[in-house]
Amino acid sequence: MTEKNEKTHKTIEQAEQEGKYIRKVRSFVKREGRLTNNQERAINDHWQTMGLNHSDGVIDAPTLFANENPVVLEIGFGMGKSLVEMAKAAPELNFIGIEVHKPGVGACISSAVEESVSNLKVCEHDAIEILADCIPDDTLTTVQLFFPDPWHKKKHHKRRIVSAEFVETIRQKLKVGGVFHMATDWENYAECMLEDMQSAPGYNNLSESNDYVPRPDSRPLTKFENRGQNLGHGVWDLQFAKKA
């Protein structure tokens, strides 16, 4: 082991002994595409009212949204079209969206402003760190994870965001009865998600067949998903509720 590697190993070991969570493998690769003028303008003009920063610390949702409405958290909202559609359709809920890619954040804010959506806040940051540092336990009504990167090569499976540790983190953040809703169009990932969830303590599978659920009306059918279904591709939805 080189001196540099030895120092890194000691740093990680020391942090773990102190009870700190060290993330060793990320579930995403940050490909920073160029912002369009519209996306950049949306961020500059509306971040003050719609944006959340990791550095802001723990989120107090009633203060943030100025109401006591239930909170839905979406991890990895892409360009935000579906998230904005859901927020507009459910003004009785508050939505927080997390996305690591800035163009998607800009597009989401732009769409929300265009649709006059006021019950949505967005954050450009790693969801694992937001969950650890900013989301209080027992506060979320729903956590949504739709079409995460499947990392389909077996050697990359360790990068998949869904793991035993991750689903336990989600359980801690959900209220009793709160739902963790996942969807994927990659069958192997769906099977792995199901295995992780069925092995995790503290959850009830909402599927009548104890596996997958039909796509609920609350999750919009995306153009990509619709095209895939027309070609015979499958999509798997999973919903698990936190036990008392």
UniProtKB/Swiss-Prot annotation:
Residue numbers binding substrate: K153, D185, T222, K223, F224, E225
InterPro entries associated with the record: SAM-dependent_MTases_sf, tRNA_(Gua-N-7)_MeTrfase_Trmb, tRNA_methyltr_TrmB_bact
Enzyme class: transferase
Positions of the catalytic residues: D149
GO cellular component assignments: tRNA methyltransferase complex
UniProt keyword list: Methyltransferase, S-adenosyl-L-methionine, Transferase, tRNA processing
GO MF terms held by the record: tRNA (guanine(46)-N7)-methyltransferase activity
Entry's EC annotation: 2.1.1.33
Signal peptide: none
Binding site for S-adenosyl-L-methionine: E74, E99, D126, D149
Metabolic or biological pathway: tRNA modification; N(7)-methylguanine-tRNA biosynthesis
Catalytic activity: guanosine(46) in tRNA + S-adenosyl-L-methionine = N(7)-methylguanosine(46) in tRNA + S-adenosyl-L-homocysteine
Its job: Catalyzes the formation of N(7)-methylguanine at position 46 (m7G46) in tRNA.
Entry-linked HAMAP family: tRNA_methyltr_TrmB
Family to which the UniProt record says this protein belongs: Belongs to the class I-like SAM-binding methyltransferase superfamily. TrmB family.
The name this protein goes by in its record: tRNA (guanine-N(7)-)-methyltransferase
Higher taxonomy: Bacteria, Pseudomonadati, Pseudomonadota, Gammaproteobacteria, Alteromonadales
